[in-house]
Amino acid sequence: MDEKNVFDVPQFGVAGFPPAFFESEFKKKRENIFEWLDYLSLDWIELQNTYGVKMQNEQALKYCELARKFNIGISLHAPYYITLASGDPAVVKRSIERIFRCFHLAETINANRIIFHPGHFPGTTDGDRRNGLKQLIKHLLSIKNDIPKGIYLYAETAGKKAQLGSLKDIVQICSAVSFVKPCLDLAHVHGFTGGTLYSEESIYTVLDYVEEKLGVNALQDIHFHMYPVEVDKNGEKKHRAFNETIENQQLCLMDEAHSNIYYPRPEHFINAIKRKSMTPVIVCEALNSQESGARIMKDIYYRKDNI
């Protein structure tokens, strides 16, 4: 557990620039996102580098300054193109180069968390998955001595069953590589498992598993993505908002015991982390409502009557 990564209270924030930001009085400059988050009493932003790290040093330094001014934490989401399990050496080489560019940006912008997807693996069998995981771990270990100290990669759980990133995969990566920590996207866990996070206890069981495999200190290292999701036979289908309802339940993997809302639910999640005395970073990726989803979770956390 890195003490610099531990907070006295949970940090609630957003992924990227929510649509509501561009409808606000702060919309004239993207750098105003930090003041906007402070205005909303939120604590964090995860900057998306989906299609590559393109931010220039000057902009990164400006963001760093504003984040400090408004006391907003920053994490980076690495490009989706990182595929360390590929059988093509050229693809692996480009993936490692993208990781190094993320580390450079993290140093400049004063972020110590880089979230990445373990990605695809060649083949379709369980054996192919195991081999892909071995290759990913091998390539991560190969850069151990070349990365800056105090900045960590966070391996994110996958939403699609055909990808690396099951909860078991993430634990195995974190066990093998000292500079990798777990990013639990609970909507992805819900989707990957075919829809299982319908209760506080089911989320608590996920936390128990991480604690059992990685130790109690690992609980404070977890970085969360939290929002509801629509699920189909392949896993995650679509991000949803907390206030969305299901119009045609026959299209969803639900049974009569569950209502017409999407899961996982914020109250189940907050109660589970409170039972574990966790104070993590929680990034909301709810559909077109990241900031309101983050506020919902923060309000539940500080509400005295939640049980």
Segments from the language model and where they lie:
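Distinct, well-ordered alpha-helical segments
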Residues: 23-34, 56-64, 126-144, 160-178, ...
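A short, acidic, amphipathic alpha-helical segment used as a generic capping/interface helix at domain edges
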Residues: 205-215, 250-277
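Active-site beta-loop-alpha junctions enriched in small/polar residues
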Residues: 15-20, 48-52, 79-83, 119-121, ...
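Acidic/histidine-rich catalytic cores of soluble enzymes
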Residues: 142-240, 246
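Hydrophobic faces of well-ordered beta-strands that scaffold small-molecule active sites
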Residues: 10-17, 45-47, 74-78, 114-116, ...
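N-terminal pre-domain/capping segments
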Residues: 1-101
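Acidic (Asp/Glu)-rich catalytic clusters
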Residues: 3-7, 33-41, 54-75, 102-110, ...
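Active-site acidic/histidine proton-transfer and metal-coordination neighborhood
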Residues: 68-69, 85-184, 191
